[in-house]
Amino acid sequence: MLFTDYMANFLVGYFSVLSSIMPLLAETSSTGEGLKLLGAGVAIIGVAGAGIGQGAVGQGACMAIGRNPEMAPKITSTMIIAAGIAESGAIYALVVAILLIFVA
């Protein structure tokens, strides 16, 4: 079988599946519903910032423990507090996104 035959079979199968799914993808809600979900997606961007912040905190703690192993317990406790503060922003972003999806 030639490559063109494989491609023809693939395209026929792809478009047959696509034609059966397209009616299900038709617009069934208002623009407000879409904007609400878009706002929830924008709100969840705050989670990425919290992840970057926690990564920076962990990196700094590992570097500090590597330079001064005797201070490991104090550095670890400070790192956990800083990670908790960074995580609070992610929790707030998640709460806002959930409120936008289910309440607004």
Curated annotation (Swiss-Prot):
Q: Report the transmembrane regions from the record.
A: 37-57, 83-103
Q: List the Pfam families hit by this protein, alphabetically.
A: ATP-synt_C
- PROSITE patterns, per the entry: ATPASE_C
Keyword field: ATP synthesis, Cell membrane, CF(0), Hydrogen ion transport, Ion transport, Lipid-binding, Membrane, Transmembrane, Transmembrane helix, Transport
Q: Where in the cell is it found?
A: Cell membrane
Task: Give the family from UniProt.
Answer: Belongs to the ATPase C chain family.
Q: What is this protein called?
A: ATP synthase subunit c
Lineage of the organism: Bacteria, Bacillati, Mycoplasmatota, Mollicutes, Entomoplasmatales
